[in-house]
Curated annotation (Swiss-Prot):
This is Polynucleotide 5'-hydroxyl-kinase GRC3. Residues 38-61 are annotated as: Disordered. InterPro entries: Clp1/Grc3, CLP1_P, P-loop_NTPase. ATP binds at residues 268-275. GO terms for biological process: cleavage in ITS2 between 5.8S rRNA and LSU-rRNA of tricistronic rRNA transcript (SSU-rRNA, 5.8S rRNA, LSU-rRNA); rRNA processing. Residues 51-61 have a biased composition (Polar residues).
Length: 680
């Protein structure tokens, strides 16, 4: 698919205003519009000629895999399970399902699953058996393919503990292979659609379902946090192809030949199935080893394992069914660092430095514990993206490098070009599965931001009230006139901006106001040694102290204990008269931050890269609707009396509801626009 076709199909740069149904208008003009920092931004960089390095890599072992192309169009779009009074038992907060041989269900929404009898296959590939203590959360959203739960034959009875109760006793017969229990799981994510209308179908919510469109059994799910897809409604299930399963089984067998933890890196073009394969491998290794697996996510654009604008190393001991929900900040079993951008090309040297630090953390802490490592990479394998891969593979030297491609023959010219110059011990080619999400990269990044700032605890989110209805945290900032024992925000920095070179210091507030910033704590002794390099202005003594981007790069040592990354904060506004920031940050992080500053005497640094606040958090949607309704009423009155004033109309700065003329007016803000005739 071309970049233009992808943009046409996946256009998701929704306006701050929406129609009555919460849907954004489509742009049907004949121009190519590129949204900055979308995952399609690297297209030009990929096409550019970049000299390859002359470093000779050791001759790797290339493992040939079958070149059979799986049938990627045979999607499963509905359950073949047919509910009745015998196999479908309904309770107020859970249901029990009996599956016969070869039956499966597609699950949409959020639930907790317990296997009560026998065994099941998840996504047609992951074998799990009954045990009362194995309660698995399922977070299934419309941004991804839905999980499939199918019955299967028990392989080994050892370890299986069936749960026979009065509720399911009649299902313990030869007619049924598997019994599962699905319980309600309300995390708060189901309410994100009321907070941001374009996400009203992202998670299952009975509030958006019309009764007249439902069958008798579908109507039962209106009291649950999940549903079973009983007929084709445009959903697609995750059905792992048999060829993938065979290749994964061979890979795991090779890994188990010795007891040394292995590193597996996955590369491929955009939308080729890297994240799906990474998660499939993660689940396969966890279930095969019953041991924790480490996961290094190198995609800063739309990762479900990292905070927005960050890169992370996380550890997982349970399989992930559906969407991964990151743990709250401060989790001791994960390491994150602020990168600041959504594409590696914005700060490539910083990008590589963070990845090397995260890999060292794995090498020194988690590899000795026996953790295997899975590395998921961005879809940028041409041009300068290839140069980054050259450097990263030379440093990591993965045991297994998996290339997702249209052709699984290693001798294929494109595959040979993609693998040339990379350092690895063994390589495999997997058939790519090319499927586009219903939601654009822009929308997925917005979801990541909203879920981060509205997360209350692990698997708990608050979208009941607007974030602006909460009082912001007031943090004083240090100026040239502050005392030596000042506690608060000691310095700020903007990546790629040095004073006198890229901007003037008196423009600083306009650069950081109303933005998302990374928050680092710096050891106070280390801070004292660099205080002389901070930029101050005697003429603007109300400004916070500024750290140049070049000094920031030298300051933050990602492998050092002198600095601690505390997550993200949202700068709502800056009061220059009283010298404080109004900020929002997740509630679970606020107490930890206060304790670190007051009791342990850390100094605080706020740093910004790309940091747009999501529009739903910037303005209250209800206020916009009220202004729109006020204007409608005013226009009706003015038709009868043109002299009616607008004193009763709610006024919001920088927002207008007046229609623009198509000719001579301004419809939309556009960036990097080229007409078709301008293409070369």
């Amino acid at each position: 698919m071309s970049a233009y076709a992808a943009l046409q199909k996946m256009s998701g740069a929704s306006s701050i205003l929406y129609g009555i149904n919460g849907e954004s208008d489509n742009d049907e003009s004949g121009t190519i519009g590129y949204l900055r920092n979308s995952s399609d931004e690297e297209v030009e960089a990929e096409e550019a000629e970049v000299p390859t390095t002359s470093t000779m890599a050791p001759t790797p072992n290339i493992i040939r895999t079958p070149s059979i192309v799986p049938k990627i169009n045979s999607f499963i779009c509905e359950s073949n399970f047919i509910p009745n009074d015998d196999n479908f038992i309904v309770f107020h907060d859970h249901i029990i399902i009996g599956l016969k041989a070869n039956e499966y269900i597609l699950i949409n929404g959020q639930s907790k699953m317990t296997i009560q009898r026998g065994a099941i296959l998840i996504n047609t590939g992951h074998y799990m058996f009954a045990h009362p203590n194995n309660c698995i959360p399922i977070i299934a959203s419309q941004s991804q393919s839905l999980p499939i739960i199918s019955s299967t034959q028990v392989v080994d009875r050892s370890g299986i503990k069936d749960s026979k109760t009065d509720e399911n006793m009649h299902l313990f017969s030869s007619n049924y292979k598997s019994i599962i229990k699905l319980e309600n799981l309300y995390t708060g994510l189901e309410k994100i659609g009321t907070y941001h209308p374009p996400f009203k179908r992202l998670f299952y919510s009975h509030a958006v379902i019309e009764d007249e469109d439902l069958t008798e059994y579908e109507r039962l799910f209106k009291t649950y946090s999940f549903e079973i897809i009983l007929r084709d409604r445009g959903c697609i299930g995750i059905s792992i192809e048999k060829l993938w399963l065979n290749q994964i089984q061979l890979l795991i067998s090779d890994i188990h030949e010795d007891l040394i933890p292995k590193t597996i890196m996955i590369i491929g073009n955009k939308n080729s199935g890297k994240s799906t394969l990474s998660k499939t491998l993660l689940n396969s290794l966890i279930l095969a080893n019953q041991n924790t697996v480490s996961y290094l996510d190198l995609d800063p654009g739309q990762s479900e394992f990292s905070m927005p604008y960050c890169l992370s190393l996380t550890n997982h001991s349970k399989p992930i069914i559906g969407m991964n929900v990151p743990k709250v900040s401060g989790d001791e079993d994960s390491v994150s660092h602020y990168y600041g951008f959504t594409t590696p090309q914005s700060q490539p040297s910083q990008y590589v430095s963070i990845i090397k630090a995260l890999f060292r953390e794995y090498d020194q802490v988690y590899r000795p514990r026996g953790h295997h490592l899975i590395i998921n990479t961005p879809g940028w394998i041409k041009g300068y993206g290839k140069e980054l891969l050259n450097e990263l593979t030379a440093f990591i030297n993965p045991n297994q490098l998996i290339l997702l491609s249209n052709n699984t023959d290693n001798d294929n010219m494109d595959n040979s070009d993609n693998l040339s110059g990379l350092t690895f011990q063994n390589s495999r080619c997997f058939q790519g599965i090319y499927q586009t999400s219903k939601y654009s990269p822009f929308q997925l990044r917005m979801y990541n931001k909203l879920s981060y700032f509205h997360q209350v605890d692990t698997l708990k989110f608050d979208f009941n009230s607007h974030i602006l209805l909460r009082s912001p945290l007031k943090l004083s900032y240090e100026t040239v006139n502050s005392s030596k024992d000042f506690k608060g925000i000691n310095m700020v920095s903007v990546l790629n901006y040095d004073t006198g070179l890229n901007f003037e210091l008196n423009d600083l507030l306009s650069m950081i106001d109303t933005s998302i910033m990374g928050l680092y704590l710096i050891d106070h002794e280390y801070y004292s040694s660099l205080k002389a390099s901070l930029k101050k202005s005697e003429d603007c003594d109300y400004l916070p102290q500024y750290l140049n981007s070049t000094d920031y790069v030298n300051l933050i040592n990602y492998s050092s204990s002198n600095n601690i990354f505390m997550g993200l904060c949202m700068v709502h506004s800056i009061n220059t008269k009283d010298e404080f920031f109004n900020i929002y940050l997740p509630g679970h992080n606020q107490h930890r931050l206060t304790e670190m500053i007051t009791k342990r005497d850390y100094k605080m640094l706020l740093v910004k890269g790309d940091g747009d606040i999501p529009s739903p958090d910037l303005l209250m949607f209800d206020m916009l609707l009220k202004q729109q309704e006020d204007l409608k009423r005013l226009n009706k009155k003015r038709k009868k009396n043109p002299n009616v004033d607008d004193k009763d109309v709610l006024k919001i700065p920088y927002v207008t509801f007046e229609n623009k003329n198509k000719i001579g007016g301004i419809w939309k803000t556009r960036r990097n626009v080229m007409r078709r005739s301008h293409q070369r």
